[in-house]
Structures are given as structure tokens and as C-alpha cells.
């Protein structure tokens, strides 16, 4: 209801804002650049952040910026993912029917990646979202997959994305040391500071096409206390309240 009241062309503070219209903090841009380097060099990276701090937005942006003529991106997000279903999920995305046994599926995937690299001259990027929910056995499989040709070459880039506990409660522990030693890059997205919160709100309002100054300095202060980029309710509540207040005064 507030879109018409404020003369908006698009709805702000929703999840389907085009990636190129999203606000990018300096930490966001730095992490995006590091992931591009990971993809190019076919490295193993881990990205963590608190819930709602922009992990999904980062992955959307990362995916949209990878040239389709140079990369094939495989994406999985399944809290119950087992090693067997990990290989099946990747092979399904490549249009192949996976073999029954895990070892056979792994070799099948490695052979297909060799074809992609050698014939299509493309690099493969595998993104595993919600990785903080995965069991140790599945996380170990990434290490085994990257043990390729006596470690002389990495067959693909692997990016594990998850909440902060992926690193703090799992990968930092001694029992995960073998996995941690294979990690080439670790990135974390922090919460926005007050200035970044104001820019974040401004980017959404610019996308909406609204020319009015809707959010006062005090409103931005209050939003900054509670907002994280993936949770849009605080600014939306203010927009709705403004409409209701003006409606009651008319």
C-alpha cells in the first residue's frame, strides 16, 4: 500500500531486487573480489556471516558476475546433504545420471570436469550454501574431492557458505584440522555500521524511484540498532506507519 503513497516505481526492501541494484559495503566488495580470485585460481574458500548479513546477496552477485562463457557454476543448498547426494546433486546439474556408489560417482564427476576443462575450456565453481548445517563426513568429502592428481592441480573452485558457527563451532576445532589445512581463503561479512546502514536504505529507496526524504536521521539511528541487510521489516514498518499516520490525519 505504501508504494502508491510514496510514488514508487518498484517495491524496496524485498529479496528480488536485481543484484546490480543492491547496496555493496566496502567489506562486501572486498569479499566479492576475493571470491572472483578464488574462482579464477580454482581455490577452496569459506565465507561466513551472522544470519541476514548478506551471504545470499553476496552469492547472487558473485554468480551474476562470473562470465558464462568461462565458468560453469554448480550450487547446492541442503542441510541433509550426504556425500552420495553431494555427487548426485552436482552430476544432475551437469545433466548426468550419477552412479550408485560414492567412489564411482566421484570418479564420474572428476572425469566430467576434465572434459569441461579440456574440451569446453571452462572452469567449474561449486558453491555449497548453508554449510554450517553439514555433517563432518560431508565436509570431509570436499577435501577428498580436491585431492586430485597428487595435488598437482585443483579440479574446481569450492566455496562453502554458512553462518558464523561453520567456522567457530566446526572448522576451528582440532577434529576438522585436515579440512582447515586445505582452505585457501576465509572471508567473513560484518554487520553494517551506521553510515553503511544509511547508504543501504538509500540504495533501496533509489531503486524504488521515490524522490521523497522518507527516513529522518532519528529513524536511521533506530533502524541501525536492529537491522541486518537480509531482514527488511524495520524500514518497511516505518513506511507503513507513515502511510497510516497520514491517512488518519486526512
Predicted regions: what they are:
Residues 1-41:
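A short, basic N-terminal segment
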Residues 44, 114, 121-160, 165, ...:
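Conserved Walker B catalytic segment
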Residues 216, 227-242:
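The conserved phosphate-sensing helix
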Residues 11-12, 71-73, 81-100:
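Conserved NTP-binding/hydrolysis module of P-loop NTPases
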Residues 115-119, 150, 159, 167-226:
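Helix-loop-helix "sensor" segment of P-loop NTPases
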Residues 41-61:
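Walker A/P-loop nucleotide-binding motif
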Residues 34-37, 103-119:
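Conserved alpha-helical scaffold flanking the Walker A/P-loop in AAA+ ATPase domains
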Residues 48, 77, 128:
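Residues at the beta-strand->loop junction immediately N-terminal to the Walker
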Amino acid at each position: 500500500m505504501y508504494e502508491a503513497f510514496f510514488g514508487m516505481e518498484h517495491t524496496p526492501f524485498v529479496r528480488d531486487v536485481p543484484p546490480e541494484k543492491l547496496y555493496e559495503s566496502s567489506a562486501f566488495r572486498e569479499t566479492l573480489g576475493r571470491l572472483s580470485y578464488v574462482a579464477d585460481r580454482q581455490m577452496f574458500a569459506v565465507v561466513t556471516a551472522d544470519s541476514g548479513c548478506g551471504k545470499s546477496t553476496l552469492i547472487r552477485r558473485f554468480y551474476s558476475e562470473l562470465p558464462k562463457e568461462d565458468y560453469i557454476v554448480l550450487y547446492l543448498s541442503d542441510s541433509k546433504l550426504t556425500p552420495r547426494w553431494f555427487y548426485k546433486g552436482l552430476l544432475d546439474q551437469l545433466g548426468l545420471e550419477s552412479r550408485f556408489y560414492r567412489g564411482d560417482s566421484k570418479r564420474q564427476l572428476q572425469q566430467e570436469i576434465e572434459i569441461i576443462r579440456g574440451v569446453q575450456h571452462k572452469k567449474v565453481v561449486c558453491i555449497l550454501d548453508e554449510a554450517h548445517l553439514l555433517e563432518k563426513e560431508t565436509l570431509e568429502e570436499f577435501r577428498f574431492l580436491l585431492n586430485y592428481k597428487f595435488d598437482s592441480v585443483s579440479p574446481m573452485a569450492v566455496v562453502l557458505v554458512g553462518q558464523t558457527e561453520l567456522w567457530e563451532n566446526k572448522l576451528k576445532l582440532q577434529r576438522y584440522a585436515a579440512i582447515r589445512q586445505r582452505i585457501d581463503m576465509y572471508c567473513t561479512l560484518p554487520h553494517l555500521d551506521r553510515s553503511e546502514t544509511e547508504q543501504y536504505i538509500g540504495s533501496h529507496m533509489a531503486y524504488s524511484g521515490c524522490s521523497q526524504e522518507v527516513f529522518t536521521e532519528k529513524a536511521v539511528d533506530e533502524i541501525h540498532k536492529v537491522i541486518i541487510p537480509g531482514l527488511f521489516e524495520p524500514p518497511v514498518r516505518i513506511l507503513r506507519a507513515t502511510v497510516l499516520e497520514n491517512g488518519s490525519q486526512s
